[in-house]
Amino acid sequence: MNASHQDTGFFTEALSERDPELFGAITSELGRQRDEIELIASENIVSAAVMQAQGSVMTNKYAEGYPGRRYYGGCQYVDIAENLAIERAKQLFGCGFANVQPNSGSQANQGVFQALIKPGDTILGMSLDAGGHLTHGAAPNQSGKWFNAVQYGVRQQDNLLDYDQVEALAKEHRPKLIIAGGSAIPRQIDFARMREIADMVGAYLHVDMAHFAGLVAAGEHPSPFPHAHVATTTTHKTLRGPRGGMILTNDEDIAKKVNSAIFPGIQGGPLMHVIAAKAVAFGEALRPEFKTYIQQVIANAQALSDQLIKGGLDTVTHGTDTHVVLVDLRPKGVKGNATEKALGRAHITCNKNGVPFDPEKPTVTSGIRLGSPAGTTRGFAETEFRQIADWIIEVVDGLAANGEDANEAVEDKVKAQVAALCAKFPIYPNL
């Protein structure tokens, strides 16, 4: 057989030559990230080293199983990567066991469910409209279909987590699993109180710290341990790693169940290039400068919230302990969907979000969710975030006065100022 079947450019041809159409999309996305202010609370900007690991030859390797116990040969080097990720995760969070194979935070949660409960069991989680996550028992999600999902919320008077309601619901419904955490919670959670409630009814306490894991790792947020039986997280967001998930515990029996639940329970071969990138990110998070970064993340979120309130908006709980600022737009008489689009045209990226007891549909909303991680990674500090808050107020005021179709002048003015600020804080100069 001759070598005519070989693609001569397979190992050498650049993406720009190989697939100009896709290369164009990637180039445009790089431009968007460089030129726009990213305020989506669940997003961040990874290091060049994380991207290099994720784009490495480890993408070629199948590695079903766990380090030292694989179902494929040739895993000696991917074992090094996974062991690095595991040991660094354990060091970051002060726990005894870590599974770094979940492909996402949702799959990490599914792994916990597979390990600890069975279909039809009762779970107790925060409702989506109070700031919870889809995977905590929301009706459209698998967690809401497979389990008897009971939902708790926040207090109407201050929008803080209603621990008395959690306790009452736990005593009434006797859940097997109680979930603490969410996707739009600006305040810290009292894990000790949640464990006390779990112990009252013999439930597992599962902390989903996907949003605030970076704060925990830096020692700037209470740790779920020793209170949680098990904790899950994403590895992006405030941890500033690749998109992925992770499960942590101090209980060896739970760890064994979790490992079996992830593989062979809900996943096959892990994504070794992503696990390699997780190891890099965890190593970065162990450095002293990461603590400084997280301190700035929190300070920036608080500066953003304070300035928005001064400008006539409200923020849920009137502030934040974390990186999340949940903005109530009702004082200005505008909706979340229109505000998201208007800010997007001004090159400030955020997402519409419901606020507690929101009268609007989820596709409309009365709020927007903002976050400080990505801007802080760029180098923004309080001064920049106060300026960003002023721009948000300017766009929102224009939207209220002019409507969606006549706010172009305001949006264009802010867009030019955004471009000037982003130029002072460049990202990825070598791309």
UniProtKB/Swiss-Prot annotation:
GO terms for cellular component: cytosol. It is found in: Cytoplasm. (6S)-5,6,7,8-tetrahydrofolate binds at L128, G132, H133, L134. It is an enzyme of class 2 (transferase). InterPro entries: PyrdxlP-dep_Trfase (IPR015424), PyrdxlP-dep_Trfase_major (IPR015421), PyrdxlP-dep_Trfase_small (IPR015422), Ser_HO-MeTrfase (IPR001085), Ser_HO-MeTrfase-like (IPR049943), Ser_HO-MeTrfase_PLP_BS (IPR019798), SHMT-like_dom (IPR039429). One of its GO terms (molecular function) is glycine hydroxymethyltransferase activity. It comes from the Bacteria. SUPFAM superfamilies: PLP-dependent transferases. Homodimer. Belongs to the SHMT family. Catalyzes the reversible interconversion of serine and glycine with tetrahydrofolate (THF) serving as the one-carbon carrier. This reaction serves as the major source of one-carbon groups required for the biosynthesis of purines, thymidylate, methionine, and other important biomolecules. Also exhibits THF-independent aldolase activity toward beta-hydroxyamino acids, producing glycine and aldehydes, via a retro-aldol mechanism. This is Serine hydroxymethyltransferase. The gene is glyA1.
